Amino acid sequence: MKNRSFWIKLSVATLASSSVISLVTYLLANGPLAAKALANQRTVLQDKQARIEQWWQGEVRDIGTDLQNPKLVENSLTILQAKRHSRADINSATSLALEAILTSHQTNRNSASLLTKGGIVVFSTDHDKYAAYQPLKNTTTSLELPELASTPLNFFTNSSTGLPSISVALPIYIAPKKKAGFLAIDLDLRKLNNQIADPDTNSKKAPPSGSAAIKSYLVARTSLDQATFIAPPAQSPPEYEFKPLDSVGIRKALDGNSGEGFYLNSEGVPVIGIYQYLPNFRTALLVESRQKDIYASSRTMGLQIFEAGALLSLFSLGMGLLVDRKNNHPIES
């Protein structure tokens, strides 16, 4: 009986010890794993920030080139100063020439338009915009060319397309300090979103084996004061529906803060993330990894220790039963 009691106590002690050791091992291993994940996220965020800056500076140069093109200015003034009934002739030689000039820099734009000083579209590479009203305040950001590279731009939901939008309007002068109208550029935010696209898990640029998968995305507040993606995520359906997003990281970033931490993402999943406010676009860049993925190796290690302890516990219990059975076996005469 004493032998059986010893083996049972040993079994319980082994199981309890392995449980404590596995939990402590898991918790101790989590710290370095979280630090490693954050270090990796900082590198990723810096790279994506640099790519966004490079993309934007390229577009700023293209807009500057357009505004300094004598042919563009000449054709624009011809349209802006024309009589109302002749402005809307989209097949006129002037309109076709202007469209050809602007199309050369169309890569990052949804459209390029000419606006009167009152905000009426009198020319556009998007013919559906003709004669539409595009306010020069609240939504479209009206500014001078030297201000374009660093001025925060308004982010809003386009009432026609329902898509998040950023539009800039730069003056075209008929004389010093005398505006004839504006060149308005509607940016293609999908191209901006492409700058922070994460590599496919099967590509050569994917995170190395053992590293947690990273999700990067850009969000901004619309004119309805709701946070949303700036463009449909990659591989989303054609009729993608933008939904409000909310998390501690999103709120802090859109309030102009940058930092890192542990929080629930918009889907309620625990993540470790780093967030950065991008003042140029009034946008937040977030780089996150699921805690489940980050802690996978420490969880596996803890489970292995617990399983080993459980096996030892069962072995001890089995030994106790075997010894007890042997001691209680009747002695043959």
Question: What residue spans do the PLM features occupy?
Answer:
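Juxtamembrane extracytoplasmic/periplasmic/luminal helical "stalk" adjacent to the first N-terminal
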Residues: F6-L10, T14-A88, T103-N110, P164-V168
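Amphipathic coiled-coil signal-relay and dimerization helices
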Residues: E74-S76, G119-D126, D225-P233, I274-Y275
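Cytoplasm-proximal transmembrane signaling helix
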Residues: A284-L286, Q291-E332
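Extracytoplasmic/periplasmic sensor domains and loops in membrane signaling proteins
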Residues: H85-E99, S124-T157, D198, N202, ...
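Alpha-helical transmembrane segments and their helix-membrane boundary motifs
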Residues: K2-A16, L303-G309, V323-D324
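Extracellular/periplasmic juxtamembrane segments that couple receptor/chemosensory ectodomains to their
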Residues: I172-G181, R221-S223, A234-Q304
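Solvent-exposed, extracytoplasmic
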Residues: R87-N108, H127-K129, K137-T140, I166, ...
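Short glycine-/small-residue motifs
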Residues: I63, S124, G181-F182, A284
